[in-house]
Structure formats: structure tokens, C-alpha cells
Amino acid sequence: AGRHEFHSIMIIRHGKVVAEGWWAPYCRELRHTMYSTSKSFTSTAVGFAVTEKLLSVDDTVISFFPDQLPDTVSPFLAMMTVKDLLTMSAGQVPDPTGRISTSSGDWVKEFLATPVLKEPGTEFLYNSMATFMLSAIVQKVTGEKIADYLRPRLFEPLGIEGYDWEE
């Protein structure tokens, strides 16, 4: 436990909160940064979009961004699918997240310009930019930002409110 910083604890039994507590200075009303939890929300948005027949997990990534492709599209980039992004097996080695997320350029264009050295779908490599690309794809096919798209489909039905979503 020494390596973890706990802010709260909640015990749920039979679907009801039976106990909860917070360590100062944290409290129920304080918003917490969720970091990689957003990956779960993004993949849920992809699932809704698939259900609504707006996209398929077998769609190629490049099909969504014809105006942002590099001059030369490698065979591996051409075969990268939504499923490869979901499973973090896009084939980019090393993970381009740090380089792209600190740039001031077009992140989609930079992701697509990153060399795909491994066949997509064959090797897992943690890649937060893959989640960013999923978000960009959902925004492209729905015309809405992820939080706006999820609001009526997920957040409101579950009573999730008061959230901030970094764009």
C-alpha cells in the first residue's frame, strides 16, 4: 500500500453503498483525474457507434482520414483497423504517445505518419495515441465530441454528472 495514494474507499453490497470514507483533503465533491479510465469510456463510445452501424471494428483507420494521410501509405498502415487500435496492437514501435502528445501539430496526421513496423493485430504495445485515434474516429462518424456522444447513451442513464473531459 505504500506505493499507492488512496483517496477514498467505497463498499457496495447487493448494489447499495454500505460504507464510504475519504482521506483529507479529498472528499466526494472533489473531482479526480481518471487518467486511463478514459480508455474504457472511449472504447464504449466505439461500441455504441458500432451498434448504431456508424462504423465497424474491421474498418481501416486510414479510411476515416483521407486528407491527413502521409505521402506514402505503407502496407501495414493501410491494413491497420479500428480493432487494432482497440487492442493496442497498431504495430507502431516504439509507442509514439510521448512524441505526438507534446507536439503542437495535427495529432491525427502525426499518428498516421508514424512508421508501422509490425503487422497490425499481431503484437500488443501500450499506446495512448491509439485511444486518441479512436476518439477522433468516433468524432468523425458522429459529428460529436466523445463526451457529448456518450452523455445520452451512457452518462445520463448511469447518473454520471459533473465530469470534465479534456479535448
Please describe what each predicted stretch is.
Residues G2-H4, P25-Y26, S56, F76-M80, ...:
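Extracellular/periplasmic catalytic domains that process cell-envelope and extracellular macromolecules
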